[in-house]
């Protein structure tokens, strides 16, 4: 990701009058999710949420939604999902992984780590198998990062201490863009 950001900055410098949203550092990113995504989730669930699970790419979605949900109910548990092969949030080191959309190999400035109650690292294999299973069994075509988030949510739901709890998982994209990738190559 660092290389892509560096290249974007080069293009910005070469094109006077252009603008770069800088989604990894722009406070408008989490603010948008605080203003829209968080309230939508709260409303759709009738305020009954025990755990919220989302992958961490820019950190904006997780941070904005978490801030909103915790203001409504401080007991809501916020669960961040990261690649097992690049577990920076868990205190590990950056590394290559296949979970496009999460695990930028640095901790984004837009991520408010104080709102995260738990971090679940997910392997490429578990994310891929979960995304494929979701498509085959449920008819819902989700992407790689969605597979990781769903794997984490399913793992949480299997924990006896979470029996009867409402777990909300954010599935950020469709699997259409991954149809020709390793995700659906099998």
Where are these regions (language model features)?
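Small/polar-residue-rich loop-to-helix segments that shape phosphate-bearing ligand pockets
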Residues: 1-51, 82-135
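Terminal helix/beta-alpha structural elements that buttress the NAD(P)+-binding lobe
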Residues: 51, 76, 81, 140-142, ...
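Surface-exposed amphipathic alpha-helices with a cationic face
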Residues: 66-73, 157
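Phosphate-binding loop/pocket of nucleotide- and phosphate-handling active sites
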Residues: 154-186
